[in-house]
Amino acid sequence: MSEQLVTPENVTTKDGKINLLDLNRQQMREFFKDLGEKPFRADQVMKWMYHYCCDNFDEMTDINKVLRGKLKEVAEIRAPEVVEEQRSSDGTIKWAIAVGDQRVETVYIPEVDRATLCVSSQVGCALECKFCSTAQQGFNRNLRVSEIIGQVWRAAKIVGAAKVTGQRPITNVVMMGMGEPLLNLNNVVPAMEIMLDDFGFGLSKRRVTLSTSGVVPALDKLGDMIDVALAISLHAPNDEIRDEIVPINKKYNIETFLAAVRRYLEKSNANQGRVTIEYVMLDHVNDGTEHAHQLAELLKDTPCKINLIPWNPFPGAPYGRSSNSRIDRFSKVLMSYGFTTIVRKTRGDDIDAACGQLAGDVIDRTKRTLRKRMQGEAIDIKAV
């Protein structure tokens, strides 16, 4: 469990009330204790909040009237609102969600046997990966716990209300939306705790995945805070290419990154002994057969499966998508080494909801100095 201090600065709303979506179960129990109530009341309220997506205390029928009145005075359940919805021809739904004066994007991806929700962790991103639309928007701020878990809450409420249309309930959550999750550990971890909690969304730890570009000290800290599935945004077979397309590699190179991944795997049960490697396919940049051989050699000591991701274009990007034939040749080389290799099916690209296309609406774009400061905060273990 994380130990984020509950203070008015990080959980109160503009109305001076506590937003209960900001609290994991440990914090919720402390909140009810401060109200003079038994801890089980926290469990009851969480069940209403997350099992039934209820944000009205009056509808919580197993809570006595006096306590409901007390809760209405000091607390609320306020998830961020959907301000725009786009539906893809393949069933994918993208929601633009208001977080203060900005927007982030959340994507619902239904499949035959599951439904995955792609969740954002920051408004914008500080890492400046060259092939990603989010990075081109700059960085504004971290999302609060309520703004992260609130994306899941809002999506679950919408999908739950639309069961008659055949939409599947959310079975998987991936922290692969806007932002670098490891640069916002103090909010991302409590949000994931709620996803896993039986009184929260009750997801299996194997069905909650965090994706990172390689903030190594924060990855080491993550392993001591929570156990979830891990995916890494590698995207290159060597440091020369990765330095160019994933600039954080200049600080934490591939060898350092993969060593941290192996340390995480030693602690984790959620990963079942292997990590997911994400590798975006950029035409004549990182997609040659020689690159595939280099990648296989690079990963020989890291138990993994490899997801090859056809690059999804956005305006002004300097890259092209690898052809199907180049992706096929690349994949066959990896499989010849015995790697489980999957070519990810592109979903939602007609509504700019595919991997690397999320942009949101970042207001007051910050300059490079703030991005450097943001990276420094994550690298300083005391600050994450």
Swiss-Prot record:
The UniProt record lists the keyword tRNA processing: yes
Active site: E105 (proton acceptor), C355 (s-methylcysteine intermediate)
UniProt GO BP: rRNA base methylation; tRNA methylation
Binding site for S-adenosyl-L-methionine: G179, E180, S211, S233, L234, H235, N312
Record flagged with keyword ATP-binding: no
Keywords: 4Fe-4S, Cytoplasm, Disulfide bond, Iron, Iron-sulfur, Metal-binding, Methyltransferase, rRNA processing, S-adenosyl-L-methionine, Transferase, tRNA processing
Cofactors required: [4Fe-4S] cluster
EC number: 2.1.1.192
Disulfide cysteine pairs (residue numbers): C118-C355
Reactions that this protein is recorded to catalyse: adenosine(2503) in 23S rRNA + 2 reduced [2Fe-2S]-[ferredoxin] + 2 S-adenosyl-L-methionine = 2-methyladenosine(2503) in 23S rRNA + 5'-deoxyadenosine + L-methionine + 2 oxidized [2Fe-2S]-[ferredoxin] + S-adenosyl-L-homocysteine; adenosine(37) in tRNA + 2 reduced [2Fe-2S]-[ferredoxin] + 2 S-adenosyl-L-methionine = 2-methyladenosine(37) in tRNA + 5'-deoxyadenosine + L-methionine + 2 oxidized [2Fe-2S]-[ferredoxin] + S-adenosyl-L-homocysteine
GO cellular component terms, semicolon-separated: cytoplasm
Domain Radical SAM core: 111-350
GO molecular function terms attached to this record: 4 iron, 4 sulfur cluster binding; metal ion binding; rRNA (adenine(2503)-C2-)-methyltransferase activity; rRNA binding; tRNA (adenine(37)-C2)-methyltransferase activity; tRNA binding
Function: Specifically methylates position 2 of adenine 2503 in 23S rRNA and position 2 of adenine 37 in tRNAs. m2A2503 modification seems to play a crucial role in the proofreading step occurring at the peptidyl transferase center and thus would serve to optimize ribosomal fidelity.
HAMAP family reported for this sequence: RNA_methyltr_RlmN (MF_01849)
Protein family: Belongs to the radical SAM superfamily. RlmN family.
Protein name, per record: Dual-specificity RNA methyltransferase RlmN
Native species: Escherichia coli O9:H4 (strain HS)
